């Protein structure tokens, strides 16, 4: 079976969030089921610089505002992944991150940049590469939301059955919304600009295009698949998603054990397993305290936070709960960036409590590994969380997740309640209500369990025994593909 993944990020080359981890880990996991996967990405500088053995497939005349377009098939250094890269310098060779300039302002022509991505995916689905034609095209998030639309448009124009499409929602809150006027530049049938298409409350929505035109929809946890069908978390698309509930699947993300594995992680102070976790984590904790300038206290309960600094991630709650941690002798290490006001608040807290709180603004993959290995608790107090990978990394490293009961957090962390402690199923700490009071209470429970060393060690061992790799999830994705291919034959 041949599958083309279409995305804008791919670890370790280009990453702004968990999307990159998923698109890098899923193709190798699917290979175990006989799936031949390739990836299509925009020609951002990071990708252009990382590819090797590139072959020019085709040169395309000016389109979507691009002066020159070359489609390359290449390899990614140190991987077995075949990758198609759209080299269109006028659209993709820019400073800043993939979506915004160095001032964090979204590029005004993002609709053209990602329309080209979708359009090229449709051409590959039709046989642009004479030696490899996909049976499934699997697109990820709004950046690739037009992929199913272009494939459907091609099917309508030719009268020929198109390949089947899968669209994965990694975060419904990011929708790719643009003024209605841009539709004329997208080269799609006029009938697609309607409620039964891209139109979304007077705008064009790339996310809605994927949700409406894809044959099947997946999202990244069973709970999130339910949540997005109701008003509170549907982001205005709950009606469409409820209508398509029979085509909607919640499949948990997984952890890539080649990258996240305390037994062989070269980025942490010392390696450890579930049998050597006590001494291993103690060394990692001391190394983290030394690196971040915290007081070197082995008995201090150390809370790690690796996140985007946004309101969605629950950082507003955490600000109010800082005193609960420091007053009990706890420590905090935070790595992240985002909202400037939040950055300033956490930097001020670190200045005030310099031996108890350390803050590093920005994202550093190596530091993320060190924080997760060296912390006792990893905090993910998100208002909503489609899946979350950080808590899965925490489980893997014996760093107990403290999470809000939403989305994938609810699916992957079992609270250390009395009954769960008694039956040996507890793996972390869960709070139900999104409030400062609820977060404060669960922090107090974390301190209480930490003071009961025997129980803490049992929960940590159970956490590390959880099966959070891609094996099970990849099989579920494969079954979706298999059923679609069967329908098309």
From Swiss-Prot:
Binding, ADP-alpha-D-glucose: 15
Gene Ontology molecular function terms on file: alpha-1,4-glucan glucosyltransferase (ADP-glucose donor) activity; alpha-1,4-glucan glucosyltransferase (UDP-glucose donor) activity
CDD domains: GT5_Glycogen_synthase_DULL1-like
Reaction equation(s) it catalyzes: [(1->4)-alpha-D-glucosyl](n) + ADP-alpha-D-glucose = [(1->4)-alpha-D-glucosyl](n+1) + ADP + H(+)
Biological process (GO), any one: glycogen biosynthetic process
Group of enzyme by EC: transferase
A GO CC annotation given for this chain: cytosol
Membrane-spanning intervals of the chain: none
EC annotation from Swiss-Prot or TrEMBL: 2.4.1.21
Keyword terms: Glycogen biosynthesis, Glycosyltransferase, Transferase
Pathway(s): Glycan biosynthesis; glycogen biosynthesis
HAMAP family attached to this UniProt entry: Glycogen_synth (MF_00484)
Family membership noted in the UniProt record: Belongs to the glycosyltransferase 1 family. Bacterial/plant glycogen synthase subfamily.
Protein function: Synthesizes alpha-1,4-glucan chains using ADP-glucose.
Name the UniProt record assigns to this protein: Glycogen synthase
Species of the source: Francisella tularensis subsp. mediasiatica (strain FSC147)
């Amino acid at each position: 079976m041949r599958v083309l993944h279409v995305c804008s990020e791919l670890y370790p080359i280009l990453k702004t969030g968990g999307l990159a981890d998923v698109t890098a880990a899923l193709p190798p996991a699917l290979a175990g089921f006989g799936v031949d996967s390739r990836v299509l990405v925009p020609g951002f500088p990071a990708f252009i610089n990382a590819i090797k053995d590139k072959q020019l497939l085709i040169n395309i005349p000016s389109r979507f505002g691009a002066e020159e377009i070359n489609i390359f098939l290449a390899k990614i250094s140190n991987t077995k992944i075949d990758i198609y890269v759209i080299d269109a310098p006028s659209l993709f060779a820019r400073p800043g991150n993939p979506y915004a300039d160095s001032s964090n302002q979204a590029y005004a022509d993002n609709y053209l940049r990602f329309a080209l991505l979708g359009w090229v995916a449709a051409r590959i689905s039709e046989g642009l590469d004479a030696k490899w034609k996909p049976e499934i095209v699997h697109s990820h998030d709004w950046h690739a939301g037009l992929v199913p639309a272009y494939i459907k448009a091609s099917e309508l124009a030719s009268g020929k059955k198109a390949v089947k499409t899968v669209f994965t929602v990694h975060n419904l809150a990011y929708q790719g919304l643009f003024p209605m006027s841009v539709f004329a530049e997208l080269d799609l049938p006029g009938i697609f600009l309607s409620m039964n298409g891209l139109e979304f409350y007077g705008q064009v929505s790339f996310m809605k295009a994927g949700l409406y035109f894809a044959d099947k929809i997946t999202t990244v946890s069973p709970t999130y698949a339910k949540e997005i069908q109701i008003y509170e978390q549907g982001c205005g698309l709950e009606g469409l998603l409820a209508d398509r509930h029979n085509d909607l699947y919640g499949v948990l993300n997984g952890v890539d054990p080649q990258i996240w594995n305390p037994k062989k992680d070269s980025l942490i102070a010392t390696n450890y397993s579930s049998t050597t976790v006590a001494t291993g984590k103690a060394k990692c904790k001391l190394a983290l305290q030394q690196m971040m300038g915290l007081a070197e206290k082995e008995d201090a309960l150390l809370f790690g936070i690796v996140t985007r600094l946004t309101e969605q991630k629950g950082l507003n709650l955490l600000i109010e709960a800082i005193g609960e941690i420091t007053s009990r002798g706890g420590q905090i290490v935070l790595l992240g960036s985002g909202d400037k006001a939040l950055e300033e608040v956490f930097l001020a807290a670190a200045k005030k409590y310099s031996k108890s709180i350390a803050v590093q603004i920005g994202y550093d993959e190596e530091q993320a590994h060190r924080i997760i290995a060296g912390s006792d608790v990893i905090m993910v107090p998100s208002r909503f969380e489609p899946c979350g990978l950080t808590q899965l990394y925490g489980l893997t490293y014996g760093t107990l997740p403290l999470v809000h009961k939403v989305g994938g957090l609810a699916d992957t962390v079992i609270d250390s309640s009395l009954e769960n402690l008694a039956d040996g199923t507890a793996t972390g700490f869960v709070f139900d209500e999104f409030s400062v009071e609820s977060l404060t209470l669960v922090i107090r429970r974390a301190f209480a369990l930490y003071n009961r060393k025997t129980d803490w060690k049992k929960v940590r061992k159970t956490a590390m025994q959880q099966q959070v790799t891609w094996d099970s999830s990849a099989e579920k994705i494969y079954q979706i593909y298999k059923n679609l291919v069967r329908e098309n034959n």
